């Protein structure tokens, strides 16, 4: 009986460790946005999620767009992958908001699908150019480098 009591007590303590912070006081905007949308899927009239969603979307969008701008000023080839990942996050936010009626009433998200498509084509052209430069160099070591 004693062991059951202690295991039940430890279970209650662990369950109470979940964060009770409101949405706007959290530091990770992307995950917080998805948490708010998940809450709206369960309870579409949750006022805290409905009020926080426009602010969270704007913060996450601005943060990702700033990352994209900083990556685009770089000249390294890996910038394409970083930019595509940031646009993918923005597109996931768009998809999550559009799929939820309560969220789409509060926020009008931007669709980045065409931008991602164009960016992937630019990346492919840049990778192709870099690969042909390596292949045109004499010697096998340079061709294997890429």
Description of each model-found segment:
Residues 36-40, 68-71:
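Leucine-/aliphatic-rich long alpha-helical segments
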Residues 46-145:
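Post-signal peptide N-terminal segment of secreted/secretory-pathway proteins
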Residues 23-24, 35-39, 48-56:
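Generic N-terminal amphipathic/basic segments
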Residues 2-7:
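Sec-dependent signal peptide recognition
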Residues 11-35:
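Bacterial Sec signal peptide processing site at the extreme N-terminus
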Residues 29, 43-46:
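Residue-level recognition of tetratricopeptide repeat
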């Amino acid at each position: 009986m004693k062991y059951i009591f202690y295991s039940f007590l430890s279970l209650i303590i662990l369950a109470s460790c979940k964060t009770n912070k409101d949405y706007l006081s959290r530091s990770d905007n992307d995950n917080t946005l998805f948490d708010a949308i998940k809450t709206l899927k369960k309870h579409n009239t949750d006022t805290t999620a409905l009020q926080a969603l426009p602010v969270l979307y704007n913060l996450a969008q601005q943060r990702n767009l700033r990352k994209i701008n900083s990556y685009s000023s770089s000249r390294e080839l890996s910038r394409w992958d970083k930019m595509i990942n940031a646009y993918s996050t923005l597109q996931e936010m768009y998809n999550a908001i559009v799929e939820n009626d309560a969220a789409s009433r509060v926020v009008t998200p931007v669709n980045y699908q065409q931008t991602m498509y164009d960016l992937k084509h630019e990346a492919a052209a840049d990778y192709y150019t870099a690969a042909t430069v390596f292949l045109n160099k004499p010697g096998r070591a340079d061709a294997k480098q890429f």
